[in-house]
């Protein structure tokens, strides 16, 4: 509770500057969405994000909506969370994960069929709520014998970006009946 109150204090203190210069704050959720080593977690569910957004009720106070972080808890309904935070999502990390056990998951390719998350439904919710911020594929697996920083494979992130752009284009065309 102390950590949450300190965050609220900080956000309230900086909101006048954010208002003056049109700066959006986008807090990243806790990753994973459960306590680790006894450390407190304050942004890990719909209830947590709504509590924070309501306590600092300013359009510049928003979220980085990370599907991997929120999605690490299978009880989180990501589509519902996107609709609940409509207008307050300033940045999106969109990646797929595959549940492998209780509180266990691994990063998967972006296609819905390769993981446990419905990537189309997530992108559609962002589209339908008028999201117009940056979207990135977040982490990437190391594929095709790539040697790079673990978690940031260039090839997989490029494939993810192309996949997400394809979904966004289809949503655009569907909305215009093209």
Residue ranges of predicted features:
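Histidine-acidic metal/acid-base catalytic patches
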Residues: 8-20, 24, 34-178
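Active-site-proximal, glycine-rich beta->alpha crossover segments in alpha/beta enzymes
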Residues: 1-8
């Amino acid at each position: 509770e102390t950590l949450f109150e300190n965050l609220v204090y900080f956000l309230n203190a900086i909101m006048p500057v954010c208002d003056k210069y049109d700066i959006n704050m986008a807090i990243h959720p806790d990753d994973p969405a459960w306590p680790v080593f006894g450390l407190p977690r304050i942004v890990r569910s719909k209830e947590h994000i709504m509590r924070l957004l309501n306590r600092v009720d300013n359009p510049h106070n928003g979220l980085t909506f990370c599907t991997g972080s929120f999605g690490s808890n299978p009880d989180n309904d990501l589509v519902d969370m996107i609709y609940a935070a409509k207008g307050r999502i300033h940045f999106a990390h969109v990646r797929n994960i595959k549940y492998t056990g209780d509180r266990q998951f691994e990063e998967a390719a972006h296609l819905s069929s390769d993981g446990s998350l419905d990537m189309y439904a997530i992108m559609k919710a962002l589209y339908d709520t008028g999201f117009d911020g940056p979207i990135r594929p977040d982490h990437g697996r190391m594929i095709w014998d790539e040697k790079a920083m673990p978690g940031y494979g260039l090839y997989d992130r490029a494939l993810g970006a192309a996949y997400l752009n394809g979904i966004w284009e289809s949503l655009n065309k569907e909305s215009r009946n093209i």
